[in-house]
Amino acid sequence: MSSQPVTFQAPVAPIIPTAWPVDDVLALFNLPFNDLIFRAQTVHRENFDPTEVELATLLSIKTGGCPEDCGYCPQAARYDTGVTAQKILPLEEVLTAAREAKAHGATRFCMGAAWREPKDRDLEKVEEMVREVKAMGLETCATLGMLGEGQAEKLKNAGLDYYNHNLDTAPEFYSNVISTRDYQNRIDTLGRVRGAGIKVCCGGIVGMGESRLQRAGLIAQLCNMDPYPESVPVNNLVQVEGTPLHGTDPIDPLEFVRTVAVARITMPKARVRLSAGRREMGEAIQALCFVAGANSIFYGDKLLTTGNPEAMADQELLEKLGMHTRSTAIDARCDVTPS
């Protein structure tokens, strides 16, 4: 009796809806874990080299003293977190950090400042930083708080590639985290960024006490932007003593992986970035996140004021996984603007 040969069919990425109601996003979260990861990896392979990871470096160019009350942030002036307020860094110090980042393989350099919104005199200094970093062949990104009329255009003219402004969480949970700036303020800034022709970097933070439904609500807000963000940072809350969210029950690591997978499925062409909280994850969870569709990490020993895995540890992990870093500063697949 002869046995029949076993045939395997190559996975086919499912058709991606053009709009995602919260209930549909929640249905993805509720899939059996293996089914969700398989679907996310299939979508990922349709759009990216699954072994490639982008390295981005984040530098705090102005630390502490922020007047906002974000419950997760050690840079808020009203919280006693041990962070000392500092003025904006000198240009040469920023450029030295950018050179080091490029030498270690980073292709994107992000500059963050703890402002509610930048004053024009400070924005001029950032514009100069952007021009000089851009001249090194690095992609440039900035996160400076809310932007007023005309400020996004100034950053665009200086050569800024990306502007980061996170939604943080779902609208329904937002008031549990922040009271000094409303959700519409964030939407307005993102509209100014997009209107100026700057690519959008926008994501959120999980593990702040929100429910799965509220995590689905955050993803729905992101993926229903038109177009959705080119970069989507997924942060795992880093609990800092002195902040209101210190002591919050941590999110289950597999729930974090699910969040990455759902972001990948709903925003297939975006760079999904593992951001804050990687140091607490360990290698196995990070590896699962890469399988789930994450393809960018913040690289370096520190993110603004919180710790990050050492650069050597990141290189060793990528080698273990047989992954390589993105080698060019331009990636057309990150263009999610409808043709």
Curated annotation (Swiss-Prot):
Its EC number is 2.8.1.6. It comes from Janthinobacterium sp. (strain Marseille). Catalyzes the conversion of dethiobiotin (DTB) to biotin by the insertion of a sulfur atom into dethiobiotin via a radical-based mechanism. It is an enzyme of class 2 (transferase). This is Biotin synthase. Its cofactor is [4Fe-4S] cluster; [2Fe-2S] cluster. It holds the Pfam family Radical_SAM. One of its GO terms (molecular function) is biotin synthase activity. It catalyses: (4R,5S)-dethiobiotin + (sulfur carrier)-SH + 2 reduced [2Fe-2S]-[ferredoxin] + 2 S-adenosyl-L-methionine = (sulfur carrier)-H + biotin + 2 5'-deoxyadenosine + 2 L-methionine + 2 oxidized [2Fe-2S]-[ferredoxin]. Pathway: Cofactor biosynthesis; biotin biosynthesis; biotin from 7,8-diaminononanoate: step 2/2. [2Fe-2S] cluster binds at C110, C141, C201, R273. The lineage of its organism: Bacteria, Pseudomonadati, Pseudomonadota, Betaproteobacteria, Burkholderiales. Homodimer. Residues 51-278 form the Radical SAM core domain. CDD domains: Radical_SAM.
